[in-house]
Amino acid sequence: MGSFEIPEKHTALLQGEGGSLVIARDVPLPTLGPGHLLVKTAAVALNPCDFKTPAAFPNPGYYNGCDFAGTVVALGSDNIRDGGPWKIGDRIFGAIHGANPSDWDSGSHAEYVKAVSVFSYRIPDWMTFEEAAGLSPCCIATMGVSLFKALELPGTFEEPATKPLDVLIYGGSSSVGSLGIQMVKLTGHRLGHRCITTCSPKNFDLVKSYGADEVFDYKSPTCAQDIRKATRNCLKYAVDPFGEVKTMAICTEAIGRAGGRYSALEKFQEDVCDRKTVKRELTMGAIIIGHGLDLGGRYTRPHSPEMRAWGIEWYKSIQRLVDARKFKPHPIRVLKGGFEDMLEGLAMLKRREISAEKLVVSLDPAVSGLTADSTAR
């Protein structure tokens, strides 16, 4: 593959004052270090953390955003990835730690992205950039850390658990929820672990299509009790993407008599659950790359070479599943207005207007909707 003409500056969505986000022109390109790749962004997916993190930890002038898909246009040193070194022209998708106070130009909401070689995926020839971004590597990383590190769920994709266990994935119609359902089913022998989930009745068929075994209406006043009954008072594992008072109450009350583990993907109130037999943990997907998080309080995490080693192997496992078409993507809604639509999409998420869809913004009309196969013809 030939070389690409790379500008000295580009456009990016940066943090403004008070946690706001602004479109900035003529921003210097990210600086590549060892193990980095420069990616020309074709599409990005939007996540709630993309507006929540800048609001909670504002750093004016810093980059923002996590999920991306695009084309490798420049290489840092040591760019080895499972399957061989990355090359100029490779199609790539992944997640980076956006709004990172320790790395100002780390963020996906930009024309060019600084990706980490060992924490990125190759896009299969049959997949478009929008579809790749819509798989939401940010959610893949977060759910992986939640299920297999925080909850310590038995089984792996390569060696599924022989005994099926009940697992509650709250909010199965969310993008992270639908990924969680599929991961639970893929790590149990034959039919997988038994996945319980919640959502609105209008989305029951959707979550069942991802493999959910039983679905409950989260608005039902007896939701927790119904889950307890369905799991014979033996539920031990619960993932809560929202960490709200109501969602935490349902999850922790659904856990059986013997207790278990609860993983929240958002900060939760400790006093909502007083059950000493339920171990509670705030899970952050950004720790998968092993660097420490110095955000203060419960958001602080130490540097962990062990987590980094696990994360590298996790990415290899996910790549094999993606290549084998084992993941069914979440329904995506593509916005084609570039950075303006990026801001509007984040506002839509903030207003909670999106249900059972993943918002993806196309940044490069020339490659929108194209696969590697279609560009070769």
UniProtKB/Swiss-Prot annotation:
One of its GO terms (molecular function) is oxidoreductase activity, acting on NAD(P)H. NADP(+) binds at residues 49-52, 173-176, 200-203, 218, 265-266, 283, 354-355. Residues 18-361 are annotated as: Enoyl reductase (ER) domain. Disruption phenotype: Abolishes the production of chaetoglobosin A and 20-dihyrochaetoglobosin A. Keywords: NADP, Nucleotide-binding, Oxidoreductase. CDD domains: enoyl_reductase_like. Belongs to the zinc-containing alcohol dehydrogenase family. This is Enoyl reductase cheB. It comes from Chaetomium globosum (strain ATCC 6205 / CBS 148.51 / DSM 1962 / NBRC 6347 / NRRL 1970).
